[in-house]
Amino acid sequence: MKPLQILFALLLLPFMAVGQTIKSPNGKVAVTFSLSASGQPTYEMTFKNRQVVKPSHLGLELAKDKHASKGLQETDLMDGFKITDTKISTFDETWKPVWGQYKQIRNHYNELAVSLHQASSNRTIIIRFRVYDEGMGLRYEFPQQSSLNYFIIKEEHTQFAMTGDHKAWWLPGDYDTQEQETQETKLSEIRECFKKAVNWDNSSVSVFSPTGVQTSLQLKTQDGLYLNIHEAACVNYATMHLNLDDKNFVFESWLTPDATGLKGFMQTPCSTPWRTVMVSDDARDILASNLILNLNEPCKLQDTSWIHPVKYCGVWWEMIVGKSSWNYTDEFPSIKLDQIDWSKAKPNGRHAANTEHVKKYIDFAAANGLQQVLVEGWNVGWEDWANRWKDYVFDFVTPYPDFDIKALNDYAHSKGVKLMMHHETSSSVGNYERHLNAAFDLMQKYGYDAVKGGYVGDIIPRGDHHFSQEMNNHYLYIVKEAAKRHIMVNAHEATRPTGLCRTYPNLIGNESARGTEYEAFGGSKPDHTVVLPFTRLQGGPMDYTPGILETQLHTWSENTSYVHTTLVGQLALYLVMWGPIQMAADLPENYQKYADAFQFIKDVAVDWDDSRYLEAEPGDYITVARKAKGTDNWFVGGKCDENGHRSVVKLDFLDKGKKYECTLYADAPGADYEKNPKAYRITKRIVKKGDVLTIDEARGGGFAMSLIKK
């Protein structure tokens, strides 16, 4: 080495000495932590020696508050740090989820914990990195200390500096809704596409920046790397969005504020959620990853024997389409619950949740092996429930006059079926919490063990947002209280999941995205369900409510919308849009019209011992095989976008030397989600391990397959 080179290396030593690299167990993912010259925490990330995240800053900006910070003038945790300790460790366990895609999950990572001290404020924080074979998670931790006890977060400044103008599958950043259609653009095109991307007609919309996007964010680099940015274990903290510097392609965390405009009220000891980056050169690895679940705490429920998968039906779809109604009467322009004599109200004749009608659904469920019947609109208050910012909307215990709650539950139980409770809150959160004990008492009295919740409209307390710290605490409070009563929760319009179903597995479903209901409101693009598994489903399963076999709604209603899949494409969703709670959402009479196709919905499992992603490309196609829990039977589903797809299914996952009866539900020649959606064919054959099936999926179509071991 020349003298000049030696001198230059020596000059760099003070900076280089603070750097620390931690690699994944397989050595392919590497994260390097360092401090800048000003003492600002910085990290970068590589995959197979290719840069994935360029040097990115870390830190938090605190709000000045004489009560929370005791008058301290230093109001940030951004720079001025020195490393006081680093700890490297390895963790490797295998755990068994109560339900999910896999019978058991390996949690294997290498960890770097960096202790940092800020001399100007005498504060200490820890930044912890966990590096997995498929990515990494980082979080901030705040030990208890006299100089940092209570504090308020003004902004979190966690950066994700991209290496180029990647392709992105994104939703507009919004404090209140994820019910938007995914956009597929380059990062540089987000700004120009943003306004048109927003569903301004949603019941609650609060965008914050023309380059703001939601997580989980799926990306693809020009050289073929797949990246995914999300968060895990969001507890007592606001939901994270991302704001893009579209000149430098740097994302920065953007937290949801509460009604005060502030973003987090903290008390040490505490920590933030994990900020996650997944990476692979194979899109299938993103779908198969358990990184988000692994970053959550283990199950906190001692007894989980009462938690079970659910396949259900209900009156929901006929109301969504407009044939029936939630409300019992049209007599009142507005109502006050304690001033209405419902026995004297004039029925409108369209109320779906009436005793005789619900009995038909119970009979249908019993005859077809469905465990539960969801009944929305059973309780008084639906006459003026939505978009009023009304506090006392529902009491959650009083049925309409035509809904005999005791008789219906008795009838259902006699048939081996249960009713599923519905608690729409109209986002009046305080009202729901005031009535929660009485509502759960009623459920236990009549034998309900599952509830679908809802949060349509703007939040009360007024000015708050669906994804704020306080609202996230509310959602978790409901799940915890339900667990005490052995009640499973399926939350709609709540915050997007971040893997908390591992810790509280009675959270068996979430909506938190644009679901099947939008097919009655003009439809979602055919690529919608081959994007969501890369984005929304990263944090947990979705109650997507598939199974609409009569895709042309005008055949049985006055609704002119149509479902943007083929009939067989709907069957595929039971595999692609996985979850332990699945709805057979169509009307019983429509299933009778297509009884041979409905057989797959009856047969398909909703809980799994194993899952194999066979083909995948975001926004184009997904093919997945799943092994039904406790059996040797497999089910395979393939779904594609509006361009169609030729799927090559290699049956390598079957047991060697065994034969399987294969029933294939496929798009027929000429099938098309717009022109010929109900053209399908069903074929049977005997197959074995190593066989290869080539299946053509129509535009907006797919296929479904059962493989029953002989």
Predicted ranges, named:
Residues P618-Y660, F703-A704:
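Carbohydrate-binding surface patches
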Residues V568-E615:
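Catalytic cores of secreted or luminal carbohydrate-active enzymes
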Residues M1-T21:
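Bacterial Sec-dependent N-terminal signal peptides
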Residues T21-Q302:
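N-terminal accessory beta-strand-rich subdomains and adjacent acidic, glycine-rich linkers
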Residues Q267-K360, N368, Q372:
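An acidic-aromatic substrate-binding cleft motif
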Residues E376-T566:
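Aromatic- and carboxylate-enriched substrate-binding clefts and catalytic-loop regions
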Residues F91, Q101-K103, W170-Q178, Q183, ...:
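Solvent-exposed beta-strand/loop surfaces of large extracellular or lumenal domains
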Residues K684-K710:
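C-terminal beta-strand-rich structural cap/linker in extracellular carbohydrate-active enzymes
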